Amino acid sequence: MALFPQEALNDGVRKREVFGWAMYDFANSGYTTVVLTAVFNTYFVGVAAQGADWATLAWTLVIAASSLLVMLTMPALGAYADMHARKKALLGMTTAICVAATVALALVGRGDLWIAVVAMVISNVCYSYGESLTAAFLPELARPHSMGRVSGWGWSFGYFGGMLSLGLCLSYVLWAQARGLPATEFVPVTMLITASVY
């Protein structure tokens, strides 16, 4: 069975377009896996905030603030993208900013709380913008009865991409820890790995 059967796609949509769309999920899933879930959250609490009593709350507030920004601004951004046919351009711009902000996370050292906060808010807002913008392409790609199926292709690619990024990062972390390197040396490298895959 073909991976992207033509009958699931709208007329004129090429399979390589769907593949490219699904690969965006492959590329960006490392951000949530490594930055939000497995690596940087712990680094933020223990290193950037130096393990303070309020450190976990600070991380929660950073994520909440970035989510609130997205909630307040995404409707206007989406309307602009639709009205001016700028989805692809905005997706490219928000992706580039998210990648740059993820690279900036590599600059965070002990006590660099505000660098971490600013870079996290920017990266998470732009990641979320990218998620919404790429989802907006789905009706253009898939027939109405196949949207769930085509969306599932993107999700499955995303799982593979997230696991690849996490695998690369954890392999490096284990290598670095075996050599006695501190988190301030190996966690920044994992941010660069994540940004590179993105």
Regions of interest found by a model, annotated:
Residues M71, G92-D112:
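C-terminal ends and interior cores of transmembrane alpha-helices
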Residues T184-Y198:
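Symmetry-related core transmembrane helices of the 12-TM Major Facilitator Superfamily/SLC fold
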Residues A119-F157:
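Cytoplasmic helix-loop-helix junction between adjacent transmembrane helices
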Residues T56-A79, A100, L166:
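Central cavity-lining transmembrane alpha-helices of secondary-active solute carriers
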Residues A81-I97:
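Cytoplasmic membrane-interface "Motif A"-like loop-to-helix N-cap segments
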Residues R149-V173:
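Glycine-rich segments within core transmembrane alpha-helices of 12-TM secondary carriers
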Residues F4-S67, W114-V117:
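Helix-loop boundary and gating motifs at the non-cytosolic
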